[in-house]
Amino acid sequence: MRCADGFYYVVKFQNNPQHTRVLVNDWLGTRLGELIGLPMPAVAVVDVHPWLVEHTPELRLELCGQRKMMTAGLSFGSRYVVAPTEGQVFDYLPESAMAQVRNVQDFAGALALDKWTCNANGRQAAFWKKGRERKFTVSFIDQGYCFNAGEWSFPDAPLRGVFGRNDVYACVTGWASFEPWLSRIEAFPESSMWPLAEEIPPEWYGGEAEELEKLLTKLLERRSRVRELIEGFKDSSRNPFVNWKEAIN
């Protein structure tokens, strides 16, 4: 969807089939990623006018064989990582192309974020390049299943919130490979957490301010557990870090 600022956005509506709370998750997950220095798409609150919904056949949802209009009003917008007229975007690259991703090491930081937020989905990524650029940049998209989607719970498991292939973790040789993101999570200031809640429209969490407060409090409590959760993935049957050289104390 092209918005009033001239940029294109992927827009999620309040009555999406996942859960209204996934709008909160997308916002929080993306903003937290930004704050620890990960390449994330810009996000915005998109006010979708009722007229646009009524007169756009594509803004319909198929549920149980019935077509239903998307809900107008405040929606979540994730800006295209590159405009359609300026470059190319791929949601998949083969292993042979990973050498052409200039920031593939950022997957280690995304893993730290996903363990912190208990992303119940596999890590989603967009690989993009402008014009005639030869190398791709990866941006981390779709944080909707952070905090276990609409449940706002944290059922941690070693293989949750990870990318589907190990090759993106080939550069991980020890704890230093998770820096600076891991240290930024562990030292994430409480004073930076609460303003994020003020950015979120109450409609996205049904006005349940206490539930949102509990979620943020739990996130603060989990800062010290991220290293342990990464270690659980390291020791899993996936054997994701084949180049790990550092001994774990």
Question: What are the roles of these predicted feature ranges?
Answer:
Residues 1-91, 114-120, 136, 143-150, ...:
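Conserved ATP-binding subdomain of kinase catalytic cores across diverse folds
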Residues 4-6, 95, 190-191:
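Short, flexible segments with low predicted structural confidence
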Residues 14, 130-249:
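C-terminal catalytic region of ATP-dependent kinase domains
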Residues 22, 102-106, 208:
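Aromatic-acidic/polar surface patches that form glycan- and anion
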Residues 40-49, 123-130, 232-237:
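Short alpha-helical "patches" and their helix-cap loops
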Residues 63-67, 99, 128:
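Catalytic micro-motifs at enzyme active sites that drive phosphoryl/nucleotidyl and oxygen chemistry
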Residues 86-126, 180-183:
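Conserved kinase catalytic-core helix
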